[in-house]
Curated annotation (Swiss-Prot):
Name of this protein: Nonribosomal peptide synthetase 1
Organism listed in the record: Ajellomyces capsulatus (Darling's disease fungus)
Region (Condensation 1): 738-1159
Region (Condensation 2) location: 1427-1806
Biological-process GO terms, alphabetical: amino acid activation for nonribosomal peptide biosynthetic process; secondary metabolite biosynthetic process
This protein's pathway: Siderophore biosynthesis
Family statement: Belongs to the NRP synthetase family.
Induction context: Expression is induced during iron deprivation. Also induced in response to reactive nitrogen species.
NCBIfam families listed in its UniProt record: AA-adenyl-dom
GO molecular function annotation: ligase activity; phosphopantetheine binding
PROSITE patterns reported for this sequence: CARRIER, PHOSPHOPANTETHEINE
GO cellular component assignments: cytoplasm
Gene name for this UniProt entry: NPS1
Domain Carrier: 624-699, 1282-1358
Amino acid sequence: MQLPFYVEALASNPKLLMKQHGQHATLSLHAVHIQCSGFMDILDSILKNTDQTIGQAMQLGDRELQQLWKWNASVPQTLDDCIHDIFVEKARRDPSRQAVVSWDGELSYGEVDQFSTLLAIHLIKLGVKFGNHVLLCFEKSMWTVVAVLAVMKSGGTLVLTDPSQPEARLQTIATEVGANLMLTSERQEELGKRILAGGVIVVNHDFFQQIQTSVLPPASTTDLPSVPGSSPLYTIFTSGSTGKPKGVVISHANYTSGALPRAEAVGYGPHSRVLDFPSYAFDVSIDCMLCTLAHGGCVCVPSEDDRVNNLSGAIRNMKVNMAHMTPSVARVLGEDTLSSLEVLGLGGESVSVRDAANWGKLTKVIIAYGPSECTVGCTINNEIALDRAYTSIGKGVGGVTWVVDPTDHSRLMPIGAIGELIIEGPIVGRGYLNDPERTSSVFIEDPMWLLSGCQGYPGRHGRFYKTGDLVKYDPDSSGSIVFVGRGDQQVKLRGQRVELGEVEHHLRTRLPAGNVVAAEVITPGGKGDQPTLVAFIAEKTTTKSQTNKEIATFSTELRHSLEVMDKALGSVLPRYMVPSAYIPLLEMPLLVSCKVDRKKLRSLGSAMSRKELIRHKTFSSQKEPQSERERQLAHLWKCLFGAEAEIDVQSNFFDLGGDSLMAMKLVAAARAENLLTSVADIFRHPTLAELAITLKHSDSEAEIDVPPFSLLDSHWKENNARIETAKLCGIDATSVMDVYPCTTLQEGLMALSAKVSEAYVAQRVVELADFQTAQRLQRAFETAAADSPILRTRIVQVPGRGLMQVVLKDGITWRAGTTLEEYLVKDRNESMGLGTPLARFAITSNETTGKVHFVLTIHHALYDGWSMPLVVRRVNRAFNNQESERSVAFNSFIKHLSGLNHKDSEIYWKEQLQGANGLQFPALPRAGYQTQAQSLLEQYFPLGKTSASSTSIATSIRAAWALVAGKYTLSDDVVFGETLTGRNAPVVGIEKIEGPMITTVPVRVRFDRNARVSEYLRRIHDDSILRIPHEHMGLQHIRRLSPDAREACELRTGIVIHPTTTEDGKNLTGDGPANGFVPAGDEDAAREALKFNTYALMLVCSLDPKGFLVMASFDSATIDVCQMDKVLGQFGQTVQQLCENGNALVSDLLPMTDDELAEIWRFSNTYKPNSGNEVVLGHDYSHATATWIVAPEDSEQLVPLGGIGELVIEGDFPTNTSIQISGTKWLSAGHRDIPGRQATLHKTGQLAKYNSDGSLVILGGKGGNIKSDMEIKKPEAKSRSQVTTPKQQKLRKLWARVLGISEDEVGSNDSFFDLGGDSISAMKLVSEGRMENLELVVMQVFQHRRFHDMADIAKESLPLQVSTKQYSPFSTLDVSDVDTFISESIRPSLLNSSWKVVDVLPARPLQEIAVDGTINLPRYSARYELFYLDAAVDQSHLLKSCQELISRNEILRTIFVKSGGSCFGVVIEELQLPLDEYQIDGDLTAFAEQLCGLDIQTVMSLGSPFIKFFVVQSSSGLSCLIMRISHAQYDEICLPILLRQLSALYEGELVPAGLPFSSFVHHIVRNNIPQSIEYWRRLLQGSSMSVLRPSTPLISKKSIFISKTFDISSRSKEITLATLPTAAWALCLARRLSLRDVTFGEVVSGRNIDFANCDTVVGPTWQYIPVRVKFKSGWTVIDLLNFVQHQHISSTPFEGIGLKEIVRKCTDWPETTEWFDSVVHQDVEHVESLRFLSANSRMDTIYPHLEPLREWKIQAFPKGDSLCIEIVTFESWRAEADSILNEMGDIISLLVTKPNSTLFQTDVMEESTPPTS
């Protein structure tokens, strides 16, 4: 028998020989050694003294004691620094660095510092002193970080809470700490006020705008106290065994002493982007904020929704590289997400060996452990050994670890023995708040073994915390700790700390006395299920279970008590501490010690299945309704669903066939019985038992009238309201009966009517028997109007108050007509608008035919499809002389809307639509296209019974459309609009309100293709419930919340779901002639909705008991009729599958119909055996036999026609040409009469789609953006005037080459600019002309733009001769001794002193700025060019080409240094290619982008090369070449030169020549600047910089980019594109600043100077130069354009001088002027692809860091006949920017359409100047 350890004793008188044997397979060598040593020490002690006690003999031996002291000899130093001071220093050094990126905004270090200082000073003013507790109650938000630092700076003590915890618990915490102040968010404000009656501060932008004036000038750290390390930093509350949470107090010194070494062990640094995932109720959330900011990292804060539902997406979108979470959470993340992390920190629960091993292959795994009493983490394992059967929690960090006897802490345990972990050191907290007794029991001092020390280690004093955790030392001799388990009743459940005693306390206090209770965590069904908290209960008298001798049955009395208690627990305990089941026991199992046998309980629980547990959560043993409320509700349900419906307490409303319409009817029926419920309650609590509990009693006599004028602003008095609105209506004030605000729907409808007069106006005609009947109907309408205010309502725009509804005393004016046709035309031509009647009534009587018609013309702002039948019912009853009940007035609904918390809705929609900026379906044919639906299709789809029990057909429709649209946009994140009844609001009698309440909301559906259908439907269903309180915000208001919201609300598809009308609904209107004013049935009602379609595609789904009819109204320019027919088929089939396959995966659903699949096979099946036919698709796939389009993520799924997928090609190709697929099931199976086959498919990496005619459209590579599939037609050649002379022929060739047109398109009378020329092409023309011995200068191109004029002034010269005047290196320097200068000032600054210096140049001003933007963070001047190569390249040849590129271009061999306050470019003779190479297996694009993100964090210092190359080779054969370059080495004109040189070097072609930058700099410094001074001095004499400063405080310096595209097709081609935006901005500035003389900046190439071949200079020649416009009286638009264009032309020879030089030498501006206040940028040439032999290189450009904003940027991007203007400014100035952009559009329109308008008589200059805020 092999034993792991045994001792062999051999007697040898007088000695005893002992031999120890250990098996290395089970014990490490160190463990064997420890066992042996311990055994020998005890044996030796017994033999020496047989009189001692066993306890004395068990004392540790010297060798073991010395080992323990060796591990714990030094206690880490106490660090008295405060973390917020460390942060402040980081912010001071690098204020622009990103500190927080959050769903609700971004903050830099400077902004966090500024805001937290402002708030801290405010707190101090409110009386916060050292140690005062300040509560923080936030959902996940960037403002939490600010609030935390603010409290720290003020000296207060943080109390972080999680608002999702029960309010009673939060109230207990607030009372315990004695807080007088709470910092909170807008969303939690109401909760905060309930917890703390006063002192609640909402932290947001508005708050800082308010306090800034009271704190400034200026708020700084000098206004703040110096916080001592001994001051308490935070109090964190954990579970307490007495039922009350216990507060642990941690000081600044405690925290810092642990945080800094812990951060070092984990790997925090400036590159860290840390996920703020943990709940604020747990201290690890503090680490996520403070450790990150103390080390220069970025805190990444997801929304609460993303944190729970889209964690992987949040990690990906925020580029998180470090995350801390429990293993349970980590298990839900995919491998791609885990591998994107640099560090995965695990804690909160045990980490299995398997998880550690699996995750360790993907990322760096770190295991942390630490009770709250010792700050966040007291041990760290950052080197996890994967070859063991256990994991270690690591060694002490910030403290030392000891293991003691769990029952006696005065005795140390032997190494390897299990004992209690105790912590010593500066991280041990101060204790428990207000609980000295508990503190003294677990915070201990000076045990005797510590005071005694041991040989070689003197004793010491020390303070400890007893963790209660059982551990042992790692047998590997490292001193690490292995966690074994808890020694008390404290457990961890899914990372949450649960004190079982606290749970048991609340159970006992709520159950009858005498019941024995034990809470325990079990694992149902053994190891396979999730740990679950349950409660075991033994009654005094119980009934034995028939199936289990230990399990009992609860008595009826106890069941009732449990039911009451279970509901109550949720209000006092967090959700995770409420038991999931209550298990009845015959008796509680006990140990010999009479303690509960918890091991036995866990065994009992684990023997149960999850289903059995669920049964133990159901308390009622009877199914029949028991309570009065249940019986009342069951009766109501039977009335809705029929008497035959089987209803018990567990019946589900939706299982019985309920939907939103039925829910509204139930609300109304309940109200009739004086019971109150809401639609939202029905959705949240769908079972009868749950819903019955929510029912409330209502007072049937409750007043429901809203007094007239009571909904107005208190400052707008009734009399004033009457007078003002009456004037707007053109009536007497006495006729106004009420005034109240409009709904958002009415606002939108009136806005649309203002654009299109007939929009949303309906004409309804009823033919009547005779004129007498018409008169009766007329009287009936008058009677109805008296009781229905909506028929007497007009809408007016009240200045300063917005749109208002005006209810008149007499609202009906009657009209008459002779013939129906004439009246309808006349009526249609009369607009309905503001102040006019919105309902018109007429009777036409045709004497010739005898026909009588009644015409109702009504605006949709007065009715919707629900309310119109109610009005008609009222009219019919009046017609039949019947009384009508008094309805609830429309102003009741308005009152409800005015009482809503709009902040909640704003937060909801902002969070809901964050990131919803993807493609929408259908695509528009071009930018700015205005849709107009002109096509209609419909299909009917039968449905069986849904298997998704709690979801309605409406849910399946939403879900299906998301899946179908996702196929066409290649997205799993889809947005569409849905129009709802709007009657889910909790308004008494809402179902009877006569007025329009429909509302449209953006519906966002995100789906996981690997989720089950039932889960997918449940998520959509739940989303619809959450949306109910926010559905009336209105699209026009939602879109203003954020850029993402604005883009999401550009809805292309709208859906209306029209439910089945029940029999009582069909009879709603009663009998009478007015029935002709409403649709006859469900289908007619659905078609009515289509008349008001404003979408590219509108789907109206009309439901009936057997299925649904879908009608599509659409613009066939966005999707053709044939394709739309297929889309409807896919949609209907998907709805059917969702209803029938609840257990299937979403990915299993078939995306297309069988007929469509047959069509795809017909399109794709060009394969003919032995035919030799080939489909020629391009260079790479010349042997293709068939093409297919498959889902990019799953090649087993064909994409439907029109859907986007990856193009795969069938055929025989070399194996190295592509990724190959074989064995696809669909190809093997074939379809219908086409047999299947075995063939190899090749993935092209290209996205594609089929048109409806089978033609194939390539949309671009998978990694790039989808391109438009539209073609741009070239203009046809026109007849031209004769070009005869050799000089003309030479010039015509030059024009054709430069403009990219044929020579036939150039005529003698043509203008260079009419044919597409601009300033850049003018420069090229001059340069290329010089090469052809034709002399021109740029100014001449502008002045003589006609071909014949230009040919006349162009001079022919002799062939270029080599200049005898060569540039001399170092000649630009102003130094007397070049050698001394180099040796003393240059060479010491170089990274490599052996480099041979061949030239030194003074850096140009913009170069100097770019150098600073490269060496300092953020490195906004560093740019990465990525070349994705779609086939293997000769890597060694490619790298030789890169080396040659550097050798040919001195700018790439330029090293920048600073000396004497100046910056120099040092050209070295040779620079070895700076190169990093990588071999990867994963995603090439993701790795390349991540590599750029990492490289930008590395130091780029002066004296070292900025240029660098990277080669990434993928195992797939694809590769990526990356070039890093600084803006100090290139501009947008020379970069294409460099790239084309690289391509030519690789291809072995003629390399495009380039002039060295040194010769250009020499010319500028020696010639151009001296020549330019007089020009700029004359132009700028008496000028000043035009400064545009909005009055809005600059709270956020975050950049925003807003843009619009404007039509410039009417532009005169004589005016260049460069002139237009510059002139427009000059005019805009003049208006806004009320000036006639404006000066601003413009970006120019710097290459229009008189310097031969300047366009080929390889280096950054670009400049910022002034533009000055002095407006003159009498100027026309064309005068302005000509003036600006002339200034462009005249300044070109002088654009080499920099702004700094202009300011100093040419103006009297302050010398501190470093930048323009506003700058106009022009778009330049971009290279999108290069070829490397057979490899086609797709290019991408990455700027990892954004440039800090210094000015207003106005950027112009010409696109054919349109001009896109983009404004870049600060987020705080968004409103001003929006206004400016609109104004720029108006001005551009003026400039291109009214050239002869006089400026000072137009609205441009003479109207009131807009304010600057």
